[in-house]
Amino acid sequence: EYFKLQIGKIGNIIFNYYIDKNLNKVELEDSSGEVIQFNLNKSNEEIYLDTLIRNKIEIEAEYWRNIFFTYINNLRYKREEILFEKNFKNIEKALKDGNKIKIKYHNYIRLINPYFIKVSDSESRSYLFCYCEKNKDYRNYRVSEIEEIWFTNEKIEIKDKKYIDEVYKNFDPFLSYKNRVKVRFTEKGLELYEKVLINRPKFLVKDNNIYTFECDNKLAMIYFAQFFSLIEILEPQELREKLQNELENTLKIYKNREDKDV
């Protein structure tokens, strides 16, 4: 699976995408690689033979290899655009028309004001930044995880243009802009901080071993939970309490196991 799609789904999408496009020619020194097998859908099956004839394809395996290698040689966000081309086009149409859209995301239907699509530098994934009227706040939704899109005739509302512009300039998937988290590190905590780069929040300022980050609570839970006793969350209070509750629940799990083993 890739982008939560089965290989057969990916194969059908990229075949259709590259029907009228030039392919990179790939020559392999040996053919001992993994064999990929899947069935073409009815629409692609109908045009497949014509495509082989029109492109003067003599060896089908070579043709498919060129398709997959041409696709794989794209950057990750570009591969995402290929696989979810319909989503990108529908969002771009809504932005051009200036209309709200309804989306199905993680099984829930939401009415949103779409503002822009932005690629996350840390993930190379595309996000739709919007105002969600279901949740009454600003959200980032992964374009690849939007299940359905419906057009509406309602015009997009610009809730806070200054904030939207700042998020665009300082984009990150967790919407950390203007959110602050203050953390006290032990010496070993600082050593680990230097090593753990994935999802590391933006550093702002430090006072001895107390660091302040531009970071929202969700990102803080993902990043700092792995430090255990090597850090102490000082601010904000709600994050401090949430992490404390999570650690207490974890401790209960281990204590219950110990009691059963006695």
Spell out what each predicted region is:
Residues N39-S43, Y48-E58:
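Extended, charge-enriched helical/coil interaction regions that scaffold DNA-processing
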Residues E46-I47, R110-L111, N135-Y141, L190-Y193, ...:
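Short, surface-exposed beta-strand/loop "edge" segments at domain boundaries and coil↔beta transitions
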Residues V35, E123-R125, D207-T212:
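A generic structural signal for beta-strand entry/edge sites
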Residues E1, D20-E45:
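Short Lys/Arg-rich basic patches
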Residues D172-V262:
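Polybasic (Lys/Arg-rich)
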Residues L5-N16, I57-F69:
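Short amphipathic alpha-helical segments
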Residues N73-V181, V262:
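Core beta-strand-centered patch of the WYL/Sm-like small regulatory domain
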